[in-house]
């Protein structure tokens, strides 16, 4: 993601808790995010009720499969890497369009 771009993320039920966070890495197959929680999901765990709020578009609701999770002492948050489960084609397009726009902006402002 480009510097300054915020992609809020929330998980409706992580061990009984609604968790908010922010994506720092995004692709059509998965996401890296910082979450405001001390709860530690396990590798392979499926999280449902996930909402990803891409700028200037409707919120994207999905499920995630945790690939890694660890406490990040520098940010005092939980850092996760996860893959999307069961994205619809329209959701994949939504993410791909957002990422393409990010790339266009990056090229426009840093045309190396």
What residue ranges belong to the model's regions?
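Short coil/turn motifs at beta-sheet boundaries
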Residues: 2, 26, 43-45, 57, ...
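Short conserved beta-strand and strand-loop elements enriched in small hydrophobics
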Residues: 4-13, 44-60
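N-terminal helix initiation/capping motif
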Residues: 1-28, 34-39, 96-112
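Beta-strand secondary-structure signal
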Residues: 8, 32, 49-51, 63-65, ...
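Short beta-strand-centered aromatic/proline hotspots
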Residues: 21, 62-68
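Short, solvent-exposed secondary-structure boundary/capping segments
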Residues: 32-35, 70-83
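Extended Gly/Ser/Thr-rich low-complexity repeat segments
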Residues: 42-55, 92-104
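Residue-level recognition of beta-strand microenvironments
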Residues: 26, 67-71, 87
């Amino acid at each position: 993601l480009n510097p300054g771009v915020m992609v809020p993320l929330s998980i409706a039920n992580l061990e009984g808790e609604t968790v908010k966070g922010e994506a720092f890495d995004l692709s059509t197959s998965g996401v890296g995010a910082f979450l405001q929680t001390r709860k530690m999901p396990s590798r392979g765990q499926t999280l449902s009720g996930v909402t990803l709020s891409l700028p200037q578009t409707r919120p994207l609701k999905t499920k995630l499969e945790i690939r890694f999770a660890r406490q990040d002492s520098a940010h005092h948050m939980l850092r996760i890497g996860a893959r999307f489960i069961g994205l619809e084609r329209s959701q994949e397009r939504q993410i791909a369009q957002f990422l393409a726009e990010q790339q266009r902006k990056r090229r426009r402002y840093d045309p190396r």
